[in-house]
Structures are given as structure tokens and as C-alpha cells.
Regions:
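Alpha-helix capping/helix-boundary segments
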Residues: 9-10, 38, 74, 117-118
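Short, hinge-like loop/turn segments at secondary-structure boundaries
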Residues: 49-53, 85-87, 129-131
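Short, well-structured N-terminal submotif of metal-dependent ribonuclease cores
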Residues: 1-34, 46-65, 134
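Acidic, PIN/NYN-like endoribonuclease modules and their adjacent C-terminal/linker elements
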Residues: 1, 101, 105-134
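Generic structural signal for small/hydrophobic residues in well-ordered secondary structure
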Residues: 6-7, 42, 78, 104, ...
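Non-catalytic, surface-exposed connector residues within folded enzymatic/regulatory domains
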Residues: 36, 53, 72, 93-94, ...
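Active-site neighborhoods of divalent-metal-dependent phosphate/nucleic-acid chemistry enzymes
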Residues: 67-112
Length: 134
């Protein structure tokens, strides 16, 4: 199985709340990807952190270890899926989440997210949550 890591999963890792390195090792680094959108969101988060330089270095290290999937891969399905969701009154509130979900679908990747409810209306999207709550 191949995985697209949602931004919230990456943030859990960067904050030290998820042993993502170990999980990626188990799943196979070659099977784990991030979207260009996730890189944008991580950069924004780093620029708004208390220690900008440290946060940007952490993002650099993290991003350099994974293959980045371009959002252009979902261009063909974007209009079709957004129109479908609009017609049923279920447009996603977050356009970035929408693009991440479509990127997973277009590339036949399982989306790893802690926000499963945000993606329930996307047809054909496989979802996993690697966050274990006790």
C-alpha cells in the first residue's frame, strides 16, 4: 500500500507527538508521500512559530526525506468532483484539504489523516489514521 500523509500527521510528527519515522520505516519510505499543499502548510506553520529558524530547519529535514506529489496530478478530477459535491450540498470547507484528498485519489494513495471526517464525501478515497489515542 502507498500513502499520502496529510498535513496534520506531519505536524504531529514535527511536534514530537508521533513516531512517524518508525511508522514510515515499517510501511517503507518508498511508499510514503506528501503533497505540495502540505509543504505550503508546513512552511506557513514554521513562519508562525516561536522559533522560525528552528521550525524551518525541521520542515526542511522532514520534507527532504519524502517524495513530494504535485497537485497537477488531480487537475482532471478537480472540476468533476467539486461540481458533484456542490450539487449535493457537501463542498469541503478547506480547499487545501480538498486538493490533498484529490491528490491521494488521483495517485491511488491511501490518505493518512487525523481528520477523517473532513474527507468522508470524497468518492474513492481510502483513509487511515495512524494516531493512537488512549
Amino acid at each position: 500500500m502507498r500513502y499520502l500523509l496529510d498535513t496534520n500527521i506531519c505536524v504531529f510528527f514535527l511536534r514530537g507527538k508521533l513516531n512517524l519515522d518508525e511508522i514510515i520505516k515499517q510501511k517503507g519510505r518508498q511508499n510514503c508521500f506528501i503533497s505540495e499543499i502540505t509543504v505550503l502548510e508546513l512552511r506557513y506553520g514554521a513562519e508562525n512559530s516561536v522559533n522560525i529558524e528552528k521550525s524551518n530547519k525541521a520542515v526542511d529535514l522532514f520534507v527532504n526525506g519524502l517524495k513530494i506529489i504535485p497537485i497537477s496530478s488531480c487537475f482532471k478530477i478537480y472540476g468533476v468532483e467539486k461540481t458533484r459535491l456542490r450539487k449535493i450540498g457537501r463542498l469541503m470547507n478547506d480547499e487545501f484539504d480538498f486538493l490533498i484528498g484529490l491528490t491521494a485519489i488521483a495517485n491511488k494513495l491511501t490518505l493518512v489523516t487525523d481528520n477523517e471526517k473532513d474527507f468522508v464525501n470524497l468518492i474513492g478515497l481510502q483513509i487511515e489514521n495512524w494516531i493512537i489515542r488512549k
